[in-house]
């Protein structure tokens, strides 16, 4: 009599032997790579079956190596702890700390090697330095530079900047824009431009007479500025004079002129050193009126002005006059500069009030109406 399947019979070939009670599930690296996936590999697995929420390092490393090999990348490029985040059960296999140490050493060696290559590449680039062209090439190119592009041209390299310091550069620039019908002061005429002293300043002044883009800039200045000029703060008053203007009006007007020396940009930025022109071209770059400007205020009446020469100009306001038809100008002078946005009291310093005012104009040293010495 044949026996049926039962506890006394042999197990069928297609049945799988169940693990004994009390045995834990074991995970091996080759099992993870072969595509076998169990419930313990998922984050939402049953806590009764999987007691730990941490994936074993060996399993993570094995899966990471398998994925990277499929993607054509090296497994050491990504930390193993960030590769997987799932739940796993503690197992009895050997600790993978040695593998992690070896992996970290490999990453460190690759990082050091990469830094050395980057440093070597940077040294090669620094050592190359590009091509250095002779000064004659830059002087030839400078003949095609517009006056408003001189600054950009000088910033290309040191040789280009040196070319803009030469007397030949400024002489050629003057001849290129000079016309016979140009109305120029005596100091800016061709026979006076043979002097090397103040050559650069004289050429710049002449361009505001001859070069149309520069002349158009100064022709747009209104009689009364739209906003109060703020560039004169902490400027030193070098000179003051007034003169009587006789025009079409029945009563003459009075013109009050204040010559100021602006605070040097180097002092504002606390930078004492800067790029200086070559010694042989110092006369070309000499300019007694450098950083100077002229404040010209025209009034309808004569107004007594106290002595302010040598004092520091600290406050400048333009308001509407009391008759609501003209403007009122208030100037405040101090013995020392005012820094840090400190406010002044009304009784401090010397105040100059001009009212009624017909026009207020501010001329830089290159402006055609700026008075400069013929000896410059």
UniProtKB/Swiss-Prot annotation:
One of its GO terms (cellular component) is membrane. Residues 1-20, 100-127 are annotated as: Disordered. It comes from the Eukaryota. Keywords: Membrane, Transmembrane, Transmembrane helix. It is a single-pass membrane protein. It is found in: Membrane. The chain crosses the membrane at residues 300-320. Belongs to the TMEM183 family. This is Transmembrane protein 183A. The lineage of its organism: Eukaryota, Metazoa, Chordata, Craniata, Vertebrata. The gene is TMEM183A.
């Amino acid at each position: 009599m044949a026996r049926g399947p039962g506890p006394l019979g042999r197990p069928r070939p297609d049945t799988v032997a169940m693990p004994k009670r009390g045995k834990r599930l074991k995970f091996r690296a080759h099992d993870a790579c072969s595509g076998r996936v169990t419930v313990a590999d998922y984050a939402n697995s049953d806590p009764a079956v999987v007691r730990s929420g941490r994936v074993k390092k060996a399993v993570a490393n094995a899966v990471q190596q398998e994925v990277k090999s499929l993607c054509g990348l090296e497994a050491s490029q990504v930390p193993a702890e960030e590769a997987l985040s799932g739940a796993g059960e503690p197992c009895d296999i050997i600790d993978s700390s040695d593998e992690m140490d070896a992996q970290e050493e490999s990453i460190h060696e690759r990082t050091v090697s990469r830094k050395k290559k980057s440093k070597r590449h940077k040294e090669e680039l620094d050592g190359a330095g590009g091509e250095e062209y002779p000064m004659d090439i830059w002087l030839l190119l400078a003949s095609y530079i517009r006056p408003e592009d001189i600054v950009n041209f000088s910033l290309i390299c040191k040789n280009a900047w040196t070319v803009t310091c030469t007397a030949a550069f400024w002489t050629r620039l003057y001849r290129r824009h000079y016309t016979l019908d140009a109305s120029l002061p005596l100091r800016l005429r061709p026979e006076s431009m043979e002097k090397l002293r103040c050559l650069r300043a004289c050429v710049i002044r002449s361009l505001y007479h001859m070069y149309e883009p520069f002349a158009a800039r100064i022709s747009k200045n209104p009689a009364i500025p739209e906003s109060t000029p703020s560039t004169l703060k902490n400027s030193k008053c070098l000179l003051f004079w007034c003169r009587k203007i006789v025009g079409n009006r029945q009563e003459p007007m009075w013109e009050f002129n204040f010559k100021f020396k602006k605070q040097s940009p180097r002092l504002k930025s606390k930078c004492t050193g800067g790029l200086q022109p070559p010694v042989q071209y110092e006369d070309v770059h000499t300019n007694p009126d450098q950083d100077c400007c002229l404040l010209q205020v025209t009034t309808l009446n004569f107004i007594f002005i106290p002595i302010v020469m040598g004092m520091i100009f600290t406050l400048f306001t333009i308001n509407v006059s009391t008759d609501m038809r003209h403007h009122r100008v208030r100037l405040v002078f101090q013995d020392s500069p005012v820094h840090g946005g400190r406010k002044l009291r009304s009784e401090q310093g010397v105040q100059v009030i001009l009212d009624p005012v017909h026009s207020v104009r501010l001329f830089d040293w290159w402006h055609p109406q700026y008075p400069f010495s013929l000896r410059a």
